[in-house]
Amino acid sequence: MPRKFLVVVDDSPEFEAALRFASRRAKSTGGRVVMLRVLPSDSDAHWSGAREEIARQQRQEAEVLLNRLGEEAMARSGAAPVFLIEQGDAQGAIRKVVAADPDIKILVLAAGTGSRGPGPLVSAIIKHGAQIGGRKLPVTIVPGELTEEEIEDLA
C-alpha cells in the first residue's frame, strides 16, 4: 500500500498550504492524501430531531467541501484522495484515524502566521509530542505563508 499523508481540513487560512504540500509530497513519493474533516460534537439542540438535522447538514457540507478540495488534491497528487469525516475534537479524531490506518505515515499541518501563533493543533503536537494513535508518527509543519513556488521546491 502507498504511504498516506494525513491533512486535517479546517477553516484556517493556512490549511491550503498543508493540503498543497501534502499533495505534492504524495505525488513525488507515490503516496496518497487522506483528508480528514472533523465536525463538532453534538450540538446543544434540545430535541433529537433538531440535533439529527444539524448533524445531517454539517455532514452534507463536509462532503461538499471535501469533494471540492479533493479535486485540487487529485490534480496535484495524481491520485484520488481518501475522505474521512469524524465527529468530536480534532486531536481525538486524528488519534482514531491514525490508529485505524497503519498506512498513514505522516501528519501534515500548517502553522498559522502572525500574532495568532501556530494554531491549536500545532501547539498541541508540540506540547504532547508525536505519539498519535498508539504509535510515533512524523509530523510535517508547513509554514502557512509559503507560496506555490516554495511548496513546489520543498515538496
For each predicted feature, which ranges?
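General small-molecule cofactor/ligand-binding pocket signal
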Residues: 34-36, 82-86, 140-142
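Gly/Ser-rich helix-loop-strand patches that form or flank binding pockets
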Residues: 100-155
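Short, hinge-like loop/turn segments at secondary-structure boundaries
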Residues: 50-54, 99-102
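Small/aliphatic-rich secondary-structure junction motif
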Residues: 3-49, 134-135, 154
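A short acidic, glycine-rich active-site loop
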Residues: 52-64
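A short helix-to-beta-strand connector/capping loop
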Residues: 75-82, 137
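Charged docking surfaces used in two-component/phosphorelay signaling
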Residues: 85-93
